[in-house]
Amino acid sequence: MDRDHINDHDHRMSYSINKDDLLLMVLAVFIPPVAVWKRKGMFNRDTLLNLLLFLLLFFPAIIHACYVVYETSSERSYDLSRRHATAPAVDRDLEAHPAEESQAQPPAYDEDDEAGADVPLMDNKQQLSSGRT
């Protein structure tokens, strides 16, 4: 059983690349905005961000372009959809089960501190004694 579990784990973590992804990755090394434009479109947020990165700094534009190609790959989307179909459902509805308040609420900024009520309020400026001249 452990062997089947290991093989299933290896299969889930593998990522195969197709020829379009490979071509866009190579293109991303030389002209990163073109690779992002081919995947996302001309006036998309990622394309404009990559163009800005390309004009200011070349290396981050390459990393961003490779990330966009990886995230939008058809092979990756197929793998993720298959993973979600076989994964057990987890109830993570936080509104249905709100967290209990275990700590007391801190006082608001406009409230006076009752513990230090006998101490006169002072500003943070240094006070010069009136005896000095």
Swiss-Prot record:
Subcellular location: Membrane; Late endosome membrane; Vacuole lumen; Cytoplasmic vesicle membrane
PROSITE patterns tied to this protein: UPF0057
Covalent cross-link Glycyl lysine isopeptide (Lys-Gly) (interchain with G-Cter in ubiquitin), where: K125
Membrane topology: Multi-pass membrane protein
Compositionally biased spans, kind Basic and acidic residues: 90-100
Annotated stretches, region: Disordered: 89-133
MF (Gene Ontology): ubiquitin protein ligase binding
Biased composition (Polar residues): 124-133
One Gene Ontology CC term in the entry: membrane
Keyword annotations from UniProtKB, A to Z: Cytoplasmic vesicle, Endosome, Isopeptide bond, Membrane, Transmembrane, Transmembrane helix, Ubl conjugation, Vacuole
Membrane spanning residue stretches: 17-37, 49-69
One GO BP: endosome transport via multivesicular body sorting pathway
Cytoplasmic side: 1-16, 70-133
Lumenal side: 38-48
InterPro entries, A to Z: PMP3
Family named by the database record: Belongs to the UPF0057 (PMP3) family.
Other known facts: Present with 12500 molecules/cell in log phase SD medium.
Name by which UniProt lists this protein: Protein SNA3
Organism for this UniProt entry: Saccharomyces cerevisiae (strain ATCC 204508 / S288c)
Lineage: Eukaryota, Fungi, Dikarya, Ascomycota, Saccharomycotina
Gene: SNA3
